[in-house]
Amino acid sequence: MKVEVQSLDASKKGSIELNDAVFGIEPRADILHRVVTWQLEKRRAPTRATRERSDVARSGKKFGRQKGGGTARHGDRRSPIFIGGGKAHGARARVFNPSLNKKVRALGLRMALSSKAKTGTLVVIEALDVEAKTKLLAAQIQSLGFGPKVLVVDGDTVNENFARASSNLVGLDVLPAVGANVYDILKHDTLVLTRAAVEKLEARLNG
């Protein structure tokens, strides 16, 4: 698959041949769903349990007589209706640490990249060489017509000037190639890859 390469000022920089094993496979909704669900579950923090009736440190003895007192019938003081009693149907401790096969994760990333290539929302640029000026970068991004939400993926590290210029731009996120993931790719309207990012992703996913 051949894709045109451009610069941030919209000038032509030739073309690049994308590996079909990484950018040309047929996306499957079930695989993408599994990977995104796994990612979001991994982000969740463990929950702390509340003390229910059996967890409260109080006597289990019936504290009043059943009949003749003129009051409602009660058992012990651990009941949820009393101050200091256990919580009714309280939260239980949960640890979110799902597992997903590495091959499925890699397949999901290839499918996410292929999905962007298939829909024409994958853009390859030469490099992220810009001045560290937010105003200039915002004008360039707007002139390129990338859409409201853009994910830019660079090579080993993100260009420092680009990172500074883009830090205050709403809807523009930047990642190094090692941080590319299914959730962020699908969440954005346009995926922008540098030549270095393409090389890194193909080396990572074509093994």
UniProtKB/Swiss-Prot annotation:
The record's SUPFAM superfamilies line, in alphabetical order, gives: Ribosomal protein L4
Q: Which GO terms describe its biological process?
A: translation
The chain's coiled-coil residues are none
Gene Ontology terms for molecular function = rRNA binding; structural constituent of ribosome
Q: Where are the transmembrane segments?
A: none
Q: Where is this region: Disordered?
A: 44-82
> Which UniProt keywords are present, listed alphabetically?
Ribonucleoprotein, Ribosomal protein, RNA-binding, rRNA-binding
| Residue ranges, compositional bias (Basic and acidic residues) | 44-58
rRNA-binding keyword on record: yes
Q: Name one Pfam family in it.
A: Ribosomal_L4
InterPro entries referenced in this protein's UniProt entry, alphabetically:
Ribosomal_uL4 (IPR002136), Ribosomal_uL4-like (IPR013005), Ribosomal_uL4_dom_sf (IPR023574)
A GO CC annotation given for this chain: ribonucleoprotein complex
Classification via Gene3D superfamilies: 3.40.1370.10
Tell me the NCBIfam families matching this sequence. rplD_bact (TIGR03953)
Q: What does this protein do?
A: One of the primary rRNA binding proteins, this protein initially binds near the 5'-end of the 23S rRNA. It is important during the early stages of 50S assembly. It makes multiple contacts with different domains of the 23S rRNA in the assembled 50S subunit and ribosome.
Concerning its family, UniProt says: Belongs to the universal ribosomal protein uL4 family.
Q: How does it assemble?
A: Part of the 50S ribosomal subunit.
* Protein name in the entry: Large ribosomal subunit protein uL4
